[in-house]
Amino acid sequence: MATHYSANQYQSAFTPKQLHCWSIPKDFKQHPSTHDDYTQFIANERGHLLAGVPRSQKNPWGTFLGTWDLPTKIPPSKLSLTSRSAEASKRLTNWIQNSEELLHACNGLQPQISGKASGKTDPPRDSSQGQQDPPVEESNKQTPLYRGRSKAESNRSSHRSVSSEKGGITAGDKVLQAQS
């Protein structure tokens, strides 16, 4: 054992002089004040509430939601409405506000919604059309461009690179003449 052991060996570190705390300490009561009324019993010796005592409607085990009590889809806890349409932001905020179980649980959702929704609304889509593109008239159709040229022009230029040694006519030109 230590030669200078005392029960207060760790207390000296917390003295005001050691902590450099020179403020005057607050006065406190030596003993707590007495309670004037009498204590009302609300339970019997077995711990059961007596008749006439109001019972709480809350669950005695609290509002904790376990894994199996959670809904299948949980809304996001941090939601930014900055780049969303008005319809999408309304749908997300309603989803959060309608999930009351999660909002009132002790381990539940504490949503943080930030940003403003854009004023643009998407036009409603018909469910019969699905997500198909609108029909394009024949006069408006254009051939896709390949590096600034149409597909036919790019085919011609690629065939010209292979040249025959006779007369300067390429094999690609012969094929194109035969096709037209």
From Swiss-Prot:
It is found in: Cytoplasm, Cytoskeleton, Cilium basal body; Cell projection, Cilium; Apical cell membrane; Cytoplasm, Cytoskeleton, Cilium axoneme. The keyword Transferase does not apply. Its main location: cytoplasm. Keywords: Cell membrane, Cell projection, Cilium biogenesis/degradation, Cytoplasm, Cytoskeleton, Membrane. InterPro entries: Fltp. CDD domains: Flattop. One of its GO terms (biological process) is cilium organization. Residues 111-180 are annotated as: Disordered. Disulfide bonds: none annotated. GO terms for cellular component: apical plasma membrane; axonemal microtubule; ciliary basal body; cilium. Belongs to the Flattop family. Microtubule inner protein (MIP) part of the dynein-decorated doublet microtubules (DMTs) in cilia axoneme. Acts as a regulator of cilium basal body docking and positioning in mono- and multiciliated cells. Regulates basal body docking and cilia formation in multiciliated lung cells. Regulates kinocilium positioning and stereocilia bundle morphogenesis in the inner ear. This is Protein Flattop. It comes from Xenopus laevis (African clawed frog).
